[in-house]
């Protein structure tokens, strides 16, 4: 069993919603709920190339060196769409909040003087081998975070929580994607944008 495998979507698609729920409940209770460290320096053991200790902090769902939180939470949101199970949504709301805070803390990258957010892709989907990982903003990871903030706002309204922070973040992400990643001359989004240097797409 690996978190984030696409097969976990199939239970709902086949009408076997209990299987998807069972899969999610194998992982969601394991989410890291430890206090958030004040600071975490880059990992010397990998020549400061990444920060594995930071990855495994409050909100993380697995000890993997990938960001498999992202597809797992996507599976959770789509399960809620399939089932309309608001009791399960209420039960898992803290996990959703911790996940979104974890994504913001680790992977949110500010662009422009107004610091609009794109999100770094930290091996966050299984089609990862030919995608960019350089600390900048990537379209697929940013699109996931846009959708998840939209869904969090939608769920929040239905379970009596405040949707405003998630609506605001979704709005900022969409503005960032349109301004920083859209290639008007080609009619599609760039795959990524550098954070440093010339900030090329």
Over which residues does each language-model region extend?
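A short, charged helix-loop
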Residues: 124-130
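Catalytic cores of carbohydrate-active enzymes
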Residues: 38, 107-120, 134-140, 144-201
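Aromatic-rich carbohydrate-recognition surfaces in CAZymes
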Residues: 1-115, 138-146
């Amino acid at each position: 069993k690996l978190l984030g495998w696409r097969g976990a979507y199939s239970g709902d698609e086949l009408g076997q919603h209990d299987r998807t729920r069972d899969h999610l409940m194998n992982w969601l209770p394991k989410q890291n709920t430890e206090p958030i460290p004040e600071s975490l320096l880059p990992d010397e053991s990998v020549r400061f190339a990444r920060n594995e200790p930071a990855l495994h902090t409050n909100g993380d769902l697995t000890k993997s060196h990938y960001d498999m939180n992202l597809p797992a939470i996507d599976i959770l949101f789509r399960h809620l769409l399939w089932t309309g199970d608001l009791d399960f949504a209420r039960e898992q709301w803290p996990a959703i909040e911790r996940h979104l805070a974890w994504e913001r803390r680790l992977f949110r990258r500010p662009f422009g003087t107004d610091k609009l957010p794109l999100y770094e892709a930290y091996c966050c989907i299984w089609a990862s081998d030919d995608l960019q990982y350089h600390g900048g903003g990537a379209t697929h990871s940013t699109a996931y975070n846009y959708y998840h903030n939209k869904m969090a706002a939608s769920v929040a309204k239905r379970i009596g929580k405040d949707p405003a922070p998630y609506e605001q973040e979704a709005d900022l992400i969409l503005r960032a994607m349109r301004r920083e990643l859209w290639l008007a001359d080609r009619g599609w989004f760039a795959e990524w944008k550098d954070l440093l240097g010339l900030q090329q797409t």
